[in-house]
């Protein structure tokens, strides 16, 4: 039986539900990347490292809620804390103490988090970070990296997918005040930034491209960018929505010796609930204070109806509290497992792949025509994406291993070395058929 027929035979219930979903939802989904061919399975439940679909199929999950569930699905400390909060209400629309509890943990782990604001998504967090930078500097130009993904805010939806000179979407105006720099190319980046002159407000960059291919930034590259922007009176904004609390208890920038002005957080810090965090130095964040700043000179960060709701704040504090308590065991273990995954997959597939990532994140790129190391999003886009999708669908169908097809994998505290061995065996079987 061919792969697609085998998948369809195992997921008939999902097929029926997804056909119904297409009657109500554009493309059948509410997030573009959740669709994959021939159709996505429909999840019934999740616990620990497992997803269970409506047909009863059980999967070891490496997607882990868009990489946000570092403790696994529904971990007991988070579940217990949230259940207690739900008995007291989940949105009040007023100030709650749970917000302070989470902020205290973040400040203790993130050196630049002198002040914090909460929103409900990473998109909002980075959008507001850009606004803060413009208001603080009085400048207009925002620079991002080619392949950098910062959510769907119009001003930053630029140069995300190759080819970079083609607009990412209809409905966008020409964003003349947003520019893009080549990731991991310091000389090329400084050339672009230099042409912005004295109107450069900030550079927004990820320490590891998440959506762009799970590609770490060279530390010398990041330090060179920081030195340049600070010498020009501009700000360094780090998008650590993927990397924050992923490799260590805190942010990735600390290991590189960076001193950002603003950091955007999300995913892990919400404990599996919707969150976006803008945090930064006092002198930058203060401009958003509507009590002390008039309309004409403030950066308006209003939040939203559900921002800093007590359910999310409770979940986030519980998740970070558990990570803090177990940081001496969780991080060394899952980072080591990630190192092993990159090493073993590289050996299994040989020169057919470039396996990227850092710590507990990894991604297999099937390179074409003997291309070498994948070091930026353009390199990733030149790989055989269709083969990667087939590899992932093969493991979903035949091995009960779930990667969102085409995306990176995230190892959680719920995974074991035995899980990795099962993935290696599945990969060896797939490699033999190439």
UniProtKB/Swiss-Prot annotation:
Cofactor: pyridoxal 5'-phosphate
GO biological process annotation, one example: protoporphyrinogen IX biosynthetic process
Modified residues (N6-(pyridoxal phosphate)lysine): 267
Family matches, as PROSITE patterns: AA_TRANSFER_CLASS_3 (PS00600)
EC number from the UniProt entry: 5.4.3.8
Chloroplast among keywords: no
GO cellular component: cytoplasm
Membership in a protein family: Belongs to the class-III pyridoxal-phosphate-dependent aminotransferase family. HemL subfamily.
GO molecular function, one term: pyridoxal phosphate binding
Entry-linked InterPro entries: Aminotrans_3, Aminotrans_3_PPA_site, PyrdxlP-dep_Trfase, PyrdxlP-dep_Trfase_major, PyrdxlP-dep_Trfase_small
Pathway recorded for this protein: Porphyrin-containing compound metabolism; protoporphyrin-IX biosynthesis; 5-aminolevulinate from L-glutamyl-tRNA(Glu): step 2/2
Entry protein name: Glutamate-1-semialdehyde 2,1-aminomutase 2
